[in-house]
């Protein structure tokens, strides 16, 4: 495949680079590109213009081994099956909207139904299925800017939405994702990234023994459609108490009703504090990789890959239940139905601007 590369030397002879490669074509002939970002300090990420997917994310572990810590597929054809949202950008509205309906400014809106009776992750054709325009940013750190225009009425959402998402690898070994959007009408926006993490490596088996801490004292329980009931409950004395670090698998097979219903975790946590703060930290004891999550979003979904689509994944692997965990920073799911939840409303001409950062520490 044809590829293009550029690089920058920094102090201390750190060599950062961005390499562009043709990854494939969609069914209508639109080209999809891969951009490999390398910070020259042991962290690299491969980003696709299809869905803004993080295809690979390599972290150098304590033994010097490059470990790919995200699940994924090898080919565009596999990603086009739209299975599991692996590594993709999610929008306009991440997570669920009950019956695909909400009211805004006295008007009732119906958006795409794609999970039973409900809307999930933007509807039938969300941002995960778009081919994004890409621009390499002239910055001191390898950075890729992706953009799309979501038309007024697309998937039923009001307003023409101009969206920009920027991926940056910092010198301090963090993957930073900045989300920006502006609408010409009042609308709702709730964007995230749906990467599936396994800090031992994408093909290493379950994440049961990996350690997780979540900066949250409250979670939102779900009904049998995985839709929040509207309650906000204390994690104290439940399997949802990750305030102190514990193995992800410690309670994943618990008979606690909310765990049994979904075969693991698929729940929203209210992140303590305001502004840009630490939301979570995960660690693999075997290779010394720790991932810290920082965000200015109010909440985060923990999903423990309780059900993954069948088929062959990267490197010919077949992934199993609990092969990875997702930490999806977000507004609360179905927030428009509950006035006590933080509001995902974006007013006309105002800017939606949030950042989530995945910091990698090895020791």
Language-model features: locations:
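Short, Lys/Arg-enriched N-terminal segments with co-localized hydrophobic residues
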Residues: 1-15
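An exposed, glycine/acidic-rich loop-and-rim segment of catalytic or binding clefts
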Residues: 12, 16-363
């Amino acid at each position: 495949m044809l590829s293009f590369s550029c690089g920058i030397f920094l102090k201390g002879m750190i060599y950062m680079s961005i390499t562009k490669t043709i990854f494939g074509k969609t069914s209508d002939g639109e080209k999809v590109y891969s951009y490999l970002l390398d910070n020259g300090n042991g962290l690299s990420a491969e980003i696709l213009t299809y869905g803004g997917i993080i295809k690979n994310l390599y972290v150098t572990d304590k033994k010097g081994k490059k470990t790919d810590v995200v699940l994924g597929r090898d080919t565009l054809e596999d990603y086009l099956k739209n299975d599991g949202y692996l590594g993709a950008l999610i929008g306009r509205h991440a997570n669920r909207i009950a019956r695909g309906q909400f009211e805004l400014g006295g008007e009732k809106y119906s958006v795409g139904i794609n999970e039973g009776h409900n809307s999930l992750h933007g509807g039938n054709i969300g941002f995960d299925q778009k081919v994004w325009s890409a621009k390499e940013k002239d910055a001191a750190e390898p950075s890729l800017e992706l953009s799309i225009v979501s038309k007024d009425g697309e998937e039923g959402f009001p307003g023409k939405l101009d969206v920009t998402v920027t991926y940056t690898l910092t010198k301090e070994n963090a993957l930073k994702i900045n989300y920006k959007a502006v609408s010409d009408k009042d609308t709702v926006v709730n964007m995230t990234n749906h990467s599936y993490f396994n800090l031992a490596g994408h093909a290493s088996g379950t994440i049961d023994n990996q350690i997780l801490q979540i900066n949250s004292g409250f979670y939102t329980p779900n009904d049998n459609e995985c839709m929040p009931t509207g309650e906000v409950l204390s994690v104290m004395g439940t399997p949802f108490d990750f305030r102190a670090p514990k193995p992800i698998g410690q309670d994943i097979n618990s008979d606690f009703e909310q765990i049994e219903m979904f075969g693991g975790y698929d729940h929203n946590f209210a992140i303590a504090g305001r502004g840009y703060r630490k939301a979570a930290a995960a660690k693999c004891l075997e290779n010394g990789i720790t991932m810290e999550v920082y965000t200015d979003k109010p909440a985060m979904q923990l999903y423990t890959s309780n059900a993954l689509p069948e088929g062959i994944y990267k490197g010919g692997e077949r992934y199993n239940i609990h092969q990875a965990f997702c930490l999806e920073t977000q507004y609360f799911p179905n927030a428009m139905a509950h006035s006590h939840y933080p509001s995902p409303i974006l007013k006309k001409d105002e800017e939606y601007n949030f950042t989530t950062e995945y910091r990698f520490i090895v020791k």
